[in-house]
Amino acid sequence: MTDFAFDAPTVIRTKRDGGRLSDAAIDWVVKAYTDGRVADEQMSALLMAIVWRGMDRGEIARWTAAMLASGARLDFTDLPLATVDKHSTGGVGDKITLPLVPVVAACGGAVPQASGRGLGHTGGTLDKLESITGFTANLSNQRVREQLCDVGAAIFAAGQLAPADAKLYALRDITGTVESLPLIASSIMSKKLAEGAGALVLDVKVGSGAFMRSPVQARELAHTMVELGAAHGVPTRALLTEMNCPLGRTVGNALEVAEALEVLAGGGPPDVVELTLRLAGEMLELAGIHGRDPAQTLRDGTAMDRFRRLVAAQGGDLSKPLPIGSHSETVTAGASGTMGDIDAMAVGLAAWRLGAGRSRPGARVQHGAGVRIHRRPGEPVVVGEPLFTLYTNAPERFGAARAELAGGWSIRDSPPQVRPLIVDRIV
């Protein structure tokens, strides 16, 4: 069907009024937007209509396929490697990719990880890694192949992989259209299918700091993505994981890199270590790699060695100090007791206000901005002790950050309920 059969206002009205978009309409609007024939304002209206009206499974599958078809698709089937990848739907303090990728590589897997930048209140893996002096995520397809063979892993910008999603991803970030199951599922799977991994494990976050707040929503998202992977011949499974509280003790780009290095050195927060090892086990099993102990790679330093090699291969210099905000403020305890729940959304928004995230596409982030959490839920608190430290290069940001954080934590007489880190497993 020719382009003359469609126009943006008609497609927008169809979805606005609760109609179903045809395969041809989806193919046209995704391609036309990628080519610049549909304006940002028009696509913003369509995205908002999708947020409100939703999409059925057929529409989601076609939207995913249209974004996948918008660019190149990597193919590693000729390499003597078991390729496998992981993707998180986005959380607060979610630095898991940084220790996970080298752990899996040290166990014999090859991980081609096409990663993104911060979206909304959640941090982006590329923003974190680019806080390392010299690190570049812009790799050619050939360089990705070479690095998989040499290092066993590459973490790179999607580039020409699903360029339609790259434009939509940036637009959703500034138009209040992030929290949509069809848009999240299609965004993730178009990139992941394009990167050519032979298997995929999904970390679907659920809770206040996730895009899916309820387990029902998260399970629906997980099932949708597992089905999309299977339909394209990529074995896919998902873990539903807790995101009511931030992961670890840091939220922000360089702060999270430093914490990931602690994990790779054999330490680090228990929840970050637990999730890293659980996801590594799932990835190795799905890739058909057996008899390897992911935890051993943290104990013997082989995972750290892989991370150093990966960073060096991509121009990074870990001998240079990581940046930290030139100004800091500390939130202290006004009473003694036990740290209650910490709301992940509140902390994520505070870090965003401090400069760790962006408010428009292409804006620069402050690599040294963020929040350090001194007391986790259930830990004892003494009056006057530091609970959070806020970092930024722009001290005028502290007021807005404190306002976001206020009400997002409490001090109690008794410990809060302990929630399991792994909520469910979808295969």
Curated annotation (Swiss-Prot):
Record-linked InterPro entries: Glycosyl_Trfase_fam3, Glycosyl_Trfase_fam3_N_dom, Glycosyl_Trfase_fam3_N_dom_sf, Nuc_phospho_transferase, PYNP-like_C_sf, PYNP_C, Pyrmidine_PPas_bac/euk, Pyrmidine_PPase_CS
GO biological process: pyrimidine nucleobase metabolic process; pyrimidine nucleoside metabolic process
EC top class, as a word: transferase
Keywords assigned by UniProt, alphabetized: Glycosyltransferase, Transferase
Any single Pfam family the record assigns to this protein: PYNP_C
Reactions catalysed, as given in the entry: thymidine + phosphate = 2-deoxy-alpha-D-ribose 1-phosphate + thymine
Record-linked SUPFAM superfamilies: Nucleoside phosphorylase/phosphoribosyltransferase catalytic domain, Nucleoside phosphorylase/phosphoribosyltransferase N-terminal domain, Pyrimidine nucleoside phosphorylase C-terminal domain
One Gene Ontology term of the molecular function aspect: thymidine phosphorylase activity
Keyword check for rRNA-binding: no
Enzyme Commission number(s) from the entry: 2.4.2.4
Domain of life per record: Bacteria
Signal peptide: none
CC annotations in GO: cytosol
Keyword Repeat: no
Similarity-based family: Belongs to the thymidine/pyrimidine-nucleoside phosphorylase family.
Assembly and oligomerization: Homodimer.
Functional note: The enzymes which catalyze the reversible phosphorolysis of pyrimidine nucleosides are involved in the degradation of these compounds and in their utilization as carbon and energy sources, or in the rescue of pyrimidine bases for nucleotide synthesis.
Name listed for the protein in its UniProt record: Thymidine phosphorylase
Gene source species: Mycobacterium tuberculosis (strain CDC 1551 / Oshkosh)
